[in-house]
């Protein structure tokens, strides 16, 4: 007797009652997403992270961009939900890949729910976000979504590769990585909004610069901000062994020195060693280089919107302030 002629219960090694319930043979016992008890368990890492207050920079930026794009509120809410799910999922995965201990001042999700459950929940959130796209009723949204998710993972992959291989990238390579990784969700949000808008305008170049600015500022604050220390831990990028923007500049400022690369390889949690590393980075002028690069990129961002009316230019200023880059430059 071949498998195709076996009774269903014998074929699947399950009692016939399981077959009758619809648990196999191509049908779930319940439609997707209706078992509230299971969903609560599955969503727990996401819901935990969402209870920790954040700045909601992306949501506020979308509100600001909508002063230009003027899409219906219900479509804006859908796009916000897509970005929120993707951002939360990426944080869950980032904290695992970076061996982080704190997120916004509280224990990371995987230290509470476990690594396996947290990874599964993050993957689930990616598909929840994709499912939300149905509500936009726009076929092009799926292409944009897939394109930006691929870029995001490409950027993350290079960041991890450099870290784990102890290979210091060039600044140009860093900008490409950040454009894919950090800029991805900013760009996805604006591209989806542009698809839903009747306005004929392209803010992607502006958003590309904002993504790089946001990451350089984050790299700077990781090693310079007391508030960042409270939320994420002291000099976390050094413990992670990450090639952040000031670290890349510092290493390349004196290629003959192995001091900083050696510290990165140690994945040290010793605060005295990290303080020494920060003083070394300061001695190579790398924090000053960060500030100069931020000023330069702020100028580039303003050039992207230079032809706007004074009223629209105020919106651009507000968006810059949201990423910590007001009229006076870098803010903490």
Swiss-Prot record:
Catalysed reactions listed for this entry: isopentenyl diphosphate + dimethylallyl diphosphate = (2E)-geranyl diphosphate + diphosphate; isopentenyl diphosphate + (2E)-geranyl diphosphate = (2E,6E)-farnesyl diphosphate + diphosphate; isopentenyl diphosphate + (2E,6E)-farnesyl diphosphate = (2E,6E,10E)-geranylgeranyl diphosphate + diphosphate
Pathway membership, UniProt: Secondary metabolite biosynthesis; terpenoid biosynthesis
One annotated GO biological process: mycotoxin biosynthetic process
Alphabetized UniProt keyword annotations: Magnesium, Metal-binding, Transferase
Keyword Transferase belongs to the record: yes
Co-factor binding details: Binds 3 Mg(2+) ions per subunit.
Record: residues binding dimethylallyl diphosphate: 103, 181-182, 215, 222, 232, 242
Residues where Mg(2+) 1 binds: 94, 98
UniProt-annotated site: Important for determining product chain length, residues: 126
Residues at which Mg(2+) 3 binds: 218
InterPro entries: Isoprenoid_synthase_dom_sf, Polyprenyl_synt, Polyprenyl_synt_CS
Application in biotechnology: Diterpenoid pyrones display various biological activities and subglutinol A shows insecticidal and anti-HIV activities.
Functional note: Geranylgeranyl pyrophosphate synthase; part of the gene cluster that mediates the biosynthesis of the diterpenoid pyrones subglutinols A and B. The first step of the pathway is the synthesis of the alpha-pyrone moiety by the polyketide synthase dpasA via condensation of one acetyl-CoA starter unit with 3 malonyl-CoA units and 2 methylations. The alpha-pyrone is then combined with geranylgeranyl pyrophosphate (GGPP) formed by the GGPP synthase dpasD through the action of the prenyltransferase dpasC to yield a linear alpha-pyrone diterpenoid.
PANTHER family according to UniProt: GERANYLGERANYL PYROPHOSPHATE SYNTHASE, PYROPHOSPHATE SYNTHETASE ATMG, PUTATIVE (AFU_ORTHOLOGUE AFUA_8G02400)-RELATED
Family under the similarity heading: Belongs to the FPP/GGPP synthase family.
Protein name: Geranylgeranyl pyrophosphate synthase dpasD
Gene transcribed to yield this protein: dpasD
């Amino acid at each position: 007797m071949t498998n195709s002629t076996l009774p269903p219960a014998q074929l699947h090694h399950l009692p016939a009652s399981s077959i009758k319930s619809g648990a196999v043979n191509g049908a779930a016992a319940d439609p997707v997403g209706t078992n509230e008890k299971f969903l609560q368990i599955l969503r727990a890492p996401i819901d935990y992270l969402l209870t920790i207050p954040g700045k909601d920079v992306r949501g506020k930026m979308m509100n600001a961009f909508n002063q230009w794009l003027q899409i219906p509120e219900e479509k804006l809410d859908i796009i916000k939900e897509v970005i929120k799910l993707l951002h939360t999922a990426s944080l869950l995965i980032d904290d695992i890949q970076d061996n982080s201990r704190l997120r916004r001042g509280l224990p990371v999700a995987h230290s509470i729910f476990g690594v396996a459950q947290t990874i599964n929940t993050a993957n689930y959130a990616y598909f929840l976000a994709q499912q939300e796209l149905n509500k936009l009723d726009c076929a092009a949204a799926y292409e944009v979504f897939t394109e930006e998710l691929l870029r995001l993972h490409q950027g993350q992959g290079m960041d991890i590769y450099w870290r784990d291989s102890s290979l210091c990238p060039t600044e140009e390579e860093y900008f490409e990585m950040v454009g894919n990784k950090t800029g991805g969700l900013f760009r996805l949000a604006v591209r989806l909004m542009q698809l839903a808008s009747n306005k004929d305008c392209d803010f992607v170049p502006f958003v590309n610069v904002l993504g790089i600015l946001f990451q350089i500022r984050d790299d700077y604050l990781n090693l310079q901000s007391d508030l960042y220390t409270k939320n994420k831990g002291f000099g976390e990028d050094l413990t992670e062994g990450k090639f952040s923007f000031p670290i890349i500049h510092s290493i390349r400022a004196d290629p003959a020195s192995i001091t900083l690369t050696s510290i990165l390889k140690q994945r040290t949690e010793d605060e005295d060693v990290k303080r020494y590393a920060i003083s070394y980075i300061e001695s190579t002028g790398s924090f000053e280089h960060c500030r100069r690069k931020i000023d330069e990129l702020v100028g580039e961002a303003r050039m992207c919107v230079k032809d706007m009316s004074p009223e629209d230019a105020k919106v651009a200023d507000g968006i810059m302030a949201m990423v910590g880059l007001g009229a006076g430059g870098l803010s903490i």
